[in-house]
Amino acid sequence: MYAALALMFGAAIYLSVRAPSAHLRSVPPGFVRASGTRFVVDGRAFRFVGANVAVMYKDEDRAAMPETLREAALDGIKVVRVWASGEGTEENGVLSVGGDRADWPRKHPFRRAPDDWNEEAFVHLDHVLAEARRNNLHVQLCLVNWWRDTGGVTQYLRWAGIDDAADEHYKFGVNPERAMLFYTNETTRRLYREHVARIVMRRNTVTGILYRDDPTLFGYELMNEAQAPTGREAERRAWIEEMSAYIKSLDANHLITPGMWGYRSAYERREWLAVHSLPNIDYCDVHNYPRDDLDSFVDSPAALREFIDNRAAAAFSINKPLVFGEFGMSPDGYKGAAQVDWFRAYFDAAAHAGVGGAMFWILTPDPQRGYGITYKDVRDEQMRAELVRAAGLFNSLSNAAPPAALLNAGQHLIPRQFAFTRAPNDEAAKPVLKIQTDNTLLYRFAPEQAVRGRFEKLDGGDGYVWGAGVGFFEYVVPARTDRRRVSEIVVRAHLQPVPPHDADGRADETRVTLFINGTNCGAKLAAMEHQPNAVIQEWHVKNLIPRYHAWRGHALTLRFAVETDADRPFGINISNFPEWFHAGETKPIEVEVRR
């Protein structure tokens, strides 16, 4: 029905100065620290191409670890991301689900059971850090996994007596509502802190250096892709605040990031900013896989550049650096663009946006690994050449300031929107006019008669139109040739929210603001209704400017909007009642111009 146009909007408040905390003023030599929107080492700007590296779990990966890190350094990589966690065993653990289980064997866990630590895994991590040091690489350590590949959150919960968080009926085998208990359960929090302390306070058996004193470490990632369903974000945020403070109490010098997937809506963006604004969080983190993450709408290299700009602007609005911790693309490419073209767009956009680091998934000795880039096969020679080129680009732009457009506080507030516009004077958009006995003009619109719409997701058809997230629908009352006294304009609309799929009843209201010819006429909280009763929102507009336009016979543009700062930004569904039922006398939208 509509021609969809992808539109981008912008971000938040840019702070020109961020006072460094006390622990950053005395960072020892060689440590990476955050300074405003960039990283620095010994006073010099530090930007990087980075890699997730397969060195921890499979026997062949562990054996090839020294070679993998050497090859990473040869490709110009400066930071590698390593998993410093693994819980449970093949025999009694929560195992990975899906087709890549072979990539995540549980032969070398860090912790077999709550009181059964595996020193051999820690010693291997010692060797990883020693080899990284030898190759002038920094290492980012990920301390636990939301997903089941390494045991992770669901294994901790099982140890706490909560078995139903691991459930094959859910995506990736994790019941998110039950897995949220990890953040609040006293036992899981204690077990996590025990693991953190063993990592941070460990003395490397190869180098003799305490991890907390080792400049080889880039920093700590609290969790891989920490999740929280809509409406339960505060539980995750409190956990991140607690654990980041705990790590800083043990190690004041290394960087900390929460380890979140990112955001895909204006609502999620707010929470992403709130988490990354916590005092012990040093930098922001985002992941993206265009083929798999369809809600990111990254369906072209150009869309990827827009995605990166938006996240960079969000990070800069709180004056912190941004790292893309994972980006993946399979060898066969996507949407007509080759793998190497996707990676070139990724690195170029990140470099020119002022991103601190751009990492990829995953450098591996295994040519068969999904999303893997291998140094063992000629297949990836072109990709490895791209890594070298990108590393040079990041080096050349080390001292470049972020683009001014990404520091504009009024832009980039919405990740992405889709829009439609009808042609002027489209007959299909004109309402039915009824003149009442008291000479009141009554205009009736069907939902699908909107002349314009713009939302984060968007659809419509006979008897309905809906938009998710923030945005608007507009309807136009046609101009008249007569003039008439107008005491008020009454607007009625059958409005409901469009809750996120994971809200589970926690997003059953949306804040809708009515504008008439640009004048704010007030907001209503529209709730999810339950049959058989329709709930109609009603505005009695006595504002002078809309009444003046109605008196002069001007066209009246009605905008039903969910604003970017709305307390309940959960879209608009305008429909006949019952929903999906098209009946001639239903009244989803009415406008009365009263004398």
Predicted feature residues:
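Beta-strand-rich ligand-recognition modules
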Residues: 438, 446-459, 468-482, 494-588, ...
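Active-site mouth of glycoside hydrolases
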Residues: 31-295, 301-313, 317-320, 331-372, ...
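Short acidic/histidine-rich active-site segments
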Residues: 322-327
